[in-house]
A protein has these predicted regions:
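Terminal transmembrane helical module of multi-pass membrane proteins
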Residues: 116-184
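Membrane-proximal helix-loop-helix units in multi-pass membrane proteins
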Residues: 75-134
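C-terminal ends of transmembrane helices
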Residues: 49-66, 112-121, 167-174
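Hydrophobic alpha-helical transmembrane segments
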Residues: 22-29, 89-94, 114-121, 139-147
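Structural signature of hydrophobic alpha-helical transmembrane segments
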Residues: 34-45, 93-108, 156-160
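Selected alpha-helical membrane-embedding segments in polytopic membrane proteins
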Residues: 2-91
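Helical transmembrane-bundle signal
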Residues: 16-23, 43-47, 83-86, 107-117, ...
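Membrane-water interface of alpha-helical transmembrane segments
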Residues: 2-10, 33, 69, 97-104, ...
Length: 184
């Protein structure tokens, strides 16, 4: 494990929390859900993080590094495919495009990705940190199935789950990596 191992989790975590607070605030302040389109910035931050990480690539790429990278590539494709499929089905069924389903599915994808990374890295705290996100996924999906209200609080719940599932594990991972490097 190298110093900065948790940085990608921190980049995504802090960006998502900031975005959830900004979008929620704009919706509350303006009373207009058009600001929900701000979530599309999530698709823009991926290439920025990848570009920022490009200069930090290690000289030796381990099997673990490749596996973790592959896990996130698969989930990245799932995000994109989910977005395209939701839009396509809305057009197919002649419905207005509503991406609210992206919120619980994104939590599910990110939670699974973090848990799988925890399994690969053998870090129990990382395996189980997405439980908060999973509980919120079930809550959101049940609310959608039962035609419950989708409120601006969902965006804040989304941000909160990223604190628990990405920011905290990112800091713990960096601390462990730094401690391990100091031993060597």
């Amino acid at each position: 494990m190298k110093v900065g191992s948790g940085n990608v989790l921190l980049y995504w975590g802090y960006f998502t929390v900031l975005l959830s607070v900004v979008i929620s605030s704009l919706i509350v302040y303006t009373q207009n859900y058009i600001w929900s389109w701000g979530w599309m910035l999530m698709f823009a931050v991926g290439p920025v993080i990848s570009y920022k990480q490009r200069g930090c690539e290690p000289a030796v790429v381990t099997y673990t590094d490749k596996t973790i990278s592959s896990v996130w590539q698969v989930f990245g494709c799932m995000f994109g495919l989910t977005f395209v499929l939701i839009a396509a089905f809305c057009v197919l069924y002649e419905q207005s495009v509503n991406f609210i389903l992206m919120l619980p599915l994104s939590l599910l994808y990110c939670g699974l990705g973090v848990s799988i990374n925890g399994i690969i890295l053998r870090e129990k705290w990382m395996i189980y940190s997405p439980v908060v996100a999973f509980v919120l996924v079930i809550y959101m999906l049940m609310s959608l199935i039962n035609h419950g209200p989708v409120t601006v609080l969902w965006y804040l719940y989304f941000g909160l789950s990223f604190v628990v599932m990405m920011i905290i594990p990112g800091h713990i991972l960096n601390k462990k990596a730094k401690k391990q490097c100091l031993k060597n």
